[in-house]
Amino acid sequence: MNSSFHLHFLDLNLNATEGNLSGPNVKNKSSPCEDMGIAVEVFLTLGVISLLENILVIGAIVKNKNLHSPMYFFVCSLAVADMLVSMSSAWETITIYLLNNKHLVIADAFVRHIDNVFDSMICISVVASMCSLLAIAVDRYVTIFYALRYHHIMTARRSGAIIAGIWAFCTGCGIVFILYSESTYVILCLISMFFAMLFLLVSLYIHMFLLARTHVKRIAALPRASSARQRTSMQGAVTVTMLLGVFTVCWAPFFLHLTLMLSCPQNLYCSCFMSHFNMYLILIMCNSVMDPLIYAFRSQEMRKTFKEIICCRGFRIACSFPRRD
């Protein structure tokens, strides 16, 4: 970020949060629009819920050997990214609250460094989320259209290498973000990466579902076991499509905010949109909360494992859940 962008970004957070502490609807002096008051407790609550949910997802994948497949390894990577963005948003909210209430007094330069770290964590999480979604999409593509060769193409070692590569790349992006935080080109690269990755994912899914239509008759002609595997693969593709849709809806306002801040910071309508920055952070955290619910809604194996972890850890004798056919 350049200095003016960075200071406006930080001041917007501070002003919005300060308004939340004094009342629900406080007009920002630098904006003609009223800020939507969001209590600090909302950020903390969503952060805790997201953290617990995604820990549950990771625990379920580790616990259940039936979930030890490349797709669920990539889902685990996505859950880590969701945890990271929720934790960074929650910690940033706590820091702003402490600064506004004079419980924490530190130099402005150090505040900027802290803000850079939080922004870097958000940068890492969004890149990791996009890369994990792309990896899941490619996995589903291979599962559907190269079913017989799937286990030779997507091995556990190869999926582990992909995940390691994703997080190495994301960590590198985070380091670059901190080192060149004064440059608007960093933000421009992040925005470009988001829309390019989104275009790539949407194109892949359109291609996937168009090809899937031609496979419907083939699936009907397959033996029962093969047909069931193909339908399961298609269900997995639908699940990832839901994840992509939620990701787009929840993250798009944030990136539109960044785009407007670079392109028209003085425009009246742009200022109105940017005055609701905290709402866009809430949407990002909602994405982290909703992803585990989608896993549970779409996967019977996940639901069963969630029940075992939640209910049967301390009450193994009392809790017993019949298996569904």
UniProtKB/Swiss-Prot annotation:
<feature type="transmembrane region" description="Helical; Name=3">
    <location>
        <begin position="115"/>
        <end position="138"/>
    </location>
</feature>
<feature type="transmembrane region" description="Helical; Name=2">
    <location>
        <begin position="74"/>
        <end position="97"/>
    </location>
</feature>
<keyword id="KW-0564">Palmitate</keyword>
<feature type="topological domain" description="Extracellular">
    <location>
        <begin position="180"/>
        <end position="186"/>
    </location>
</feature>
<feature type="transmembrane region" description="Helical; Name=5">
    <location>
        <begin position="187"/>
        <end position="211"/>
    </location>
</feature>
<keyword id="KW-0472">Membrane</keyword>
<dbReference type="GO" id="GO:0005737">
    <property type="term" value="C:cytoplasm"/>
</dbReference>
<feature type="transmembrane region" description="Helical; Name=6">
    <location>
        <begin position="240"/>
        <end position="265"/>
    </location>
</feature>
<keyword id="KW-0675">Receptor</keyword>
<dbReference type="GO" id="GO:0004977">
    <property type="term" value="F:melanocortin receptor activity"/>
</dbReference>
<feature type="glycosylation site" description="N-linked (GlcNAc...) asparagine">
    <location>
        <position position="15"/>
    </location>
</feature>
<dbReference type="InterPro" id="IPR017452">
    <property type="entry name" value="GPCR_Rhodpsn_7TM"/>
</dbReference>
<keyword id="KW-1133">Transmembrane helix</keyword>
<feature type="topological domain" description="Extracellular">
    <location>
        <begin position="98"/>
        <end position="114"/>
    </location>
</feature>
<feature type="transmembrane region" description="Helical; Name=1">
    <location>
        <begin position="38"/>
        <end position="61"/>
    </location>
</feature>
<dbReference type="GO" id="GO:0005886">
    <property type="term" value="C:plasma membrane"/>
</dbReference>
<dbReference type="InterPro" id="IPR000276">
    <property type="entry name" value="GPCR_Rhodpsn"/>
</dbReference>
<dbReference type="InterPro" id="IPR001908">
    <property type="entry name" value="MC3-5R"/>
</dbReference>
<protein>
    <recommendedName>
        <fullName>Melanocortin receptor 5</fullName>
    </recommendedName>
</protein>
<keyword id="KW-0449">Lipoprotein</keyword>
<feature type="lipid moiety-binding region" description="S-palmitoyl cysteine">
    <location>
        <position position="311"/>
    </location>
</feature>
<keyword id="KW-0807">Transducer</keyword>
<feature type="topological domain" description="Cytoplasmic">
    <location>
        <begin position="298"/>
        <end position="325"/>
    </location>
</feature>
<dbReference type="InterPro" id="IPR001671">
    <property type="entry name" value="Melcrt_ACTH_rcpt"/>
</dbReference>
<feature type="transmembrane region" description="Helical; Name=7">
    <location>
        <begin position="274"/>
        <end position="297"/>
    </location>
</feature>
<feature type="topological domain" description="Extracellular">
    <location>
        <begin position="1"/>
        <end position="37"/>
    </location>
</feature>
<dbReference type="Pfam" id="PF00001">
    <property type="entry name" value="7tm_1"/>
</dbReference>
<comment type="function">
    <text>Receptor for MSH (alpha, beta and gamma) and ACTH. The activity of this receptor is mediated by G proteins which activate adenylate cyclase. This receptor is a possible mediator of the immunomodulation properties of melanocortins.</text>
</comment>
<keyword id="KW-0812">Transmembrane</keyword>
<comment type="similarity">
    <text>Belongs to the G-protein coupled receptor 1 family.</text>
</comment>
<feature type="topological domain" description="Cytoplasmic">
    <location>
        <begin position="62"/>
        <end position="73"/>
    </location>
</feature>
<dbReference type="GO" id="GO:0007189">
    <property type="term" value="P:adenylate cyclase-activating G protein-coupled receptor signaling pathway"/>
</dbReference>
<keyword id="KW-0325">Glycoprotein</keyword>
<feature type="topological domain" description="Cytoplasmic">
    <location>
        <begin position="139"/>
        <end position="155"/>
    </location>
</feature>
<keyword id="KW-1003">Cell membrane</keyword>
<feature type="topological domain" description="Extracellular">
    <location>
        <begin position="266"/>
        <end position="273"/>
    </location>
</feature>
<keyword id="KW-0297">G-protein coupled receptor</keyword>
<feature type="glycosylation site" description="N-linked (GlcNAc...) asparagine">
    <location>
        <position position="2"/>
    </location>
</feature>
<feature type="glycosylation site" description="N-linked (GlcNAc...) asparagine">
    <location>
        <position position="20"/>
    </location>
</feature>
<dbReference type="InterPro" id="IPR000621">
    <property type="entry name" value="Melancort_rcpt_5"/>
</dbReference>
<dbReference type="GO" id="GO:0019222">
    <property type="term" value="P:regulation of metabolic process"/>
</dbReference>
<feature type="transmembrane region" description="Helical; Name=4">
    <location>
        <begin position="156"/>
        <end position="179"/>
    </location>
</feature>
